[in-house]
């Protein structure tokens, strides 16, 4: 499910062994990206105030770094190795820092969140956006564009969005609706999509039954073809329309 994917992989600890961040002002970046890219879409009906309220709800949501202090670095190599090994499993994992959370009341997409709470604010925001009708249509459109054509028929998008809503965001069922549809097998969709450079390289390696290469060489080939790994400069990701990769 979309929501479980967004909400998974994080412990519930609220007592991280790191210093609380200083108050540096509200950053709207992820609030905007959550609404614009991952859920409702750019035309999903949210406002600038919704962006601010979502950003407020997500204050305190962060991850565990591991930055050894000077004393740790001066310890014997064996002790330091054990220390790093003990901390590595937690590095990069989610944690909620209540010391930097905005606990005031909020209103997100017309839904009121009472004040005085903590991590529940962000969890409620995920519930709200996951079940918003615009999210169903946005995700359905992206998947139909990925599997059928650059301009998928509205009728297919409607059915896929209805599946998203009916199954509470079950992506597998949405994909099933798309790939078993008459539009998927239509002549209009035949060869309407092309592989990205990444897909070209990976499919070639699979066809050759090549062993995985941990060196940077494979990534370098993908980059030479125009799609450097993690090289997209904007947060919307690489284009998923055929016209961008033909020519």
Regions found by a protein language model. Name each.
Residues 47, 65-67, 171-173, 186-187:
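Acidic/polar loop patches that form or flank catalytic/metal-binding clefts of enzymes
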Residues 1-151:
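Non-catalytic, conformational "gating/processing" segments within enzyme and secreted inhibitor domains
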Residues 132, 136-167, 176-247:
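Flexible, low-complexity segments enriched for small/polar residues
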Residues 68-72, 171-181:
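Charged/polar, low-hydrophobicity segments characteristic of intrinsically disordered regions
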Residues 117-121, 169-170, 196:
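Alpha-helix capping and helix-coil boundary motifs
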